[in-house]
Amino acid sequence: MGAMAQNPPNLRPDLAPRLVIDSPRREGQPTIGMVSLGCPKALVDSERILTRLRAEGYAISPDYAGADAVIVNTCGFLDSAKVESLEAIGEALRENGRVIVTGCLGAEPDYITGAHPKVLAVTGPHQYEQVLDAVHGAVPPAPDPFVDLLPATGVRLTPRHFSYLKISEGCNHTCRFCIIPDMRGRLASRPERAVLREAEKLVEAGVRELLVISQDTSAYGTDWKGPEKFPILPLARELGRLGAWVRLHYVYPYPHVRELIPLMAEGLVLPYLDIPFQHAHPEVLKRMARPAAAARTLDEIAAWRRDCPEIALRSTFIVGYPGETEAEFQTLLDWLDEAQLDRVGCFQYENVAGARSNALPDHVAPEVKQERWDRFMEKAQAISEVKLAAKVGRRIEVIVDEVDEDGATCRTKADAPEIDGNLFIDEGFRGLAPGDILTVEVEEAGEYDIWGRPV
């Protein structure tokens, strides 16, 4: 019986790793395994499920052999993600035999049971109670759970020094290529008090970096219809006062995003914006049902940089969207030249079951999509290389992620875990530990990573 795989599925540039977790157990204690696939938002769902199970006295197994049953939290955003999820379910069935499926792909139970009829149960995304009911049916809880085994912060699947902080569920946008609103529903923001309470507990437990996530972070709180027009602003300000790094992900490019920039200039929030622009040509954006103001976006980027010169901008793009012409793609390349984004991810368009974009005319041939992806990433890499070379000789603050006998792997304020680059320390790293924050002088730069020494 093998250990559960921990390698990233590598389906999209912004996917979280495939993770498992271990916990102490006592003889006869009911034990559950967890395989978590997909984005950081799914990772938070896995953490919540495991926290509830630990509170009920379940132990968590890092391998199939030690588990009484295995939960597979799936991704179903792209067809390739669905294939990866089915493979993970099949592996869990072969190695353990008792499998409960949850997550985004769980919204298509017939698809799962058609491929794997022996799964014990299938539940959809963030259906925590249904998952727990399925676990109780498969592996009854111990009569006297040891609640004191549960850490104050709950079960977490990230390293101890950083944590994802989910502030809302769902999305109100109707992008033609996306089925997330169908899977996760409309926007439902968590109360600010609940978010801050969770963040405070995390920081008290030693978390040095909070990664704020949702489907649409800049829309946080707009579903309340209250007097505050931009509720993410006071939330970000309060999070920034906790003393940890605060990094904002999935910020939709609304005009009022500019109000966040002063918080970055003041140092309350990291000077980093993860904004999914998706494309730059107005006609492509219109076919995507996205805002089509590329020129205004460039003006906004210039204003952000004027108000906070240290800001790092990350974005993701789709190439080969149905109907995309060579001229439209060239507009995207030209826009990227002007925007000079710091970090860029890109994937080739593919149909997703249930997406309205499937019915659009003039789908782009696979070889053309690949060729455009290659050209796009070549330009993005060249921009990254120049930007990183400009950091050589500068002193910057970094957070340590890992330390081994060869050195320390760190990140700058411009780099989120898993999706961005690293700063490596090859000398003078003895005594460093994950979560340490220190100043480093940059000595060398590559295409996506930099090297430095402590000062």
From Swiss-Prot:
Biological processes per GO annotation: tRNA modification
One annotated GO molecular function: protein methylthiotransferase activity
Highest taxon in the source lineage: Bacteria
Positions bound to [4Fe-4S] cluster 2: 171, 175, 178
CDD domains for this protein: Radical_SAM
Ranges of residues in domain Radical SAM core: 157-386
Protein localization: Cytoplasm
Comment on bound cofactor: Binds 2 [4Fe-4S] clusters. One cluster is coordinated with 3 cysteines and an exchangeable S-adenosyl-L-methionine.
Keyword hit for Endoplasmic reticulum: no
Enzyme class: transferase
EC assignment: 2.8.4.4
Chief location of this protein within or outside the cell: cytoplasm
Protein's job: Catalyzes the methylthiolation of an aspartic acid residue of ribosomal protein uS12.
Ranges of residues in domain TRAM: 389-455
Similarity comment: family membership: Belongs to the methylthiotransferase family. RimO subfamily.
Listed name of the protein: Ribosomal protein uS12 methylthiotransferase RimO
GO cellular component assignments: cytosol
Chain ranges of the MTTase N-terminal domain: 30-140
Keyword terms: 4Fe-4S, Cytoplasm, Iron, Iron-sulfur, Metal-binding, S-adenosyl-L-methionine, Transferase
UniProt-listed SMART domains: Elp3
Keyword match Transferase: yes
Pfam families: Radical_SAM (PF04055), TRAM_2 (PF18693), UPF0004 (PF00919)
Gene3D superfamilies: Methylthiotransferase, N-terminal domain, Nucleic acid-binding proteins, tm_1862 like domain
